[in-house]
Amino acid sequence: MYSVDKSNFKSMLINFDKQIQESSEIVKNSSLNFEPSKITNILYLGMGGSAIAGNLLYDTLFDHLKVPLDVVRGYLAPAYCNEHTLVIVSSYSGNTEETLSAAEKARAGKAQFLAITSGGKLKEMAEANQWSLILIPEGFPPRQALGYIYFTLYHALGTAGLFTDYKRNLTPLVHFIQKLTVRCDQQQSDCNILSRELAKTLHGKISLIYSSAPYLQTVARRWQNQFHENSKSMAFANVLPEMNHNEIVGFEQDSTAFSHFVAIFLRDKDAHPRIEKRIELTQIIIKKHGIEIVDIYTEGHTILEKVFSLILKGDWVSYYLALSHQKDPVKIKNIDFLKSELAKL
């Protein structure tokens, strides 16, 4: 079963806690020269696995951010970028063409810049322009460097005073993640069984993944992306209550395609009562079409524990689903093809 994991993807899952542990020291050793007192908004530039940390920062700091934070995926930067903007340029490889292009566009606004990368052209750009720079360890697929990207930025923004309730000491979170990881890795544990059994349920199916705003909205997207890249499996994601205003009507279609779907609801055990009622009613509608429904709940008490408990579980499900599909979780042939063809232009 594990023979297709030629790149030892599993080791990255097991060692996620180390990324959290090392992030604070990485920031301490980084060159950060932006001026927090001048910042009135944050613009986060990134793509794929390098971008999702920006959305997670927005979600997890929803109650605490002192300034607006926008995430932009693409070649351009918005016109509002100016001298009061902190532009976070995130590219794990340092060579993401869209992000480098957007960063170049953002320079016209005379903003302050913070680059986060493992090297490449972004490192060179940051050093040449004397930007704040966070260098993180290389050797990971960008999507599996999420801990480094998210938590170094968490510490950088927190120490700068750009959000309230900053926790400098994340040891309790590290211990929480360590315990959950052991459960996900042990063959007979409940978390491992959940991950493996859900992977069996999803084999050959299309996943419809739903979460809720504001704290969990990016978690559904993370599951979707991990199913795409790791499992080589088609998946779609949406967020409640928004999907109750549009997508829910799509289930009125008379289609045999519904037999290929499985609906996964990523749920907060302390969710708003109206969200809980919406999920209940949404599931009634979906069940009418014979679509199997799976509920996965958060664990922990803090927002960080809840969010990363679901991220960890989703990563393990995507891993087992990749093995079920006889696919190496690390390989991304279609993305490699696109990059190689675009490089010829």
Name each model-derived stretch:
Residues 5-15, 27-31, 37-40, 158-261, ...:
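Active-site phosphate/pyrophosphate-binding segments
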Residues 328-345:
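C-terminal helix-rich "cap/oligomerization" subdomain common to oxidoreductases
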Residues 36-182, 200, 268-271, 276, ...:
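Glycine-rich phosphate-binding loops that contact phosphosugars or nucleotide phosphates
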Residues 7-36, 78-83, 172, 294-308:
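Conserved, well-structured ligand/cofactor-binding cores
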Residues 249-333:
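C-terminal active-site/capping subdomain that shapes the small-molecule cofactor and substrate pocket
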Residues 22-29, 67-73, 189-192:
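Short gly/ser/thr-rich secondary-structure transition/capping motifs
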Residues 71-74, 233-244, 292-301:
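A generic structural motif
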Residues 25-27, 66, 156-166, 231-232, ...:
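Short helix-capping/linker segments at secondary-structure and domain boundaries
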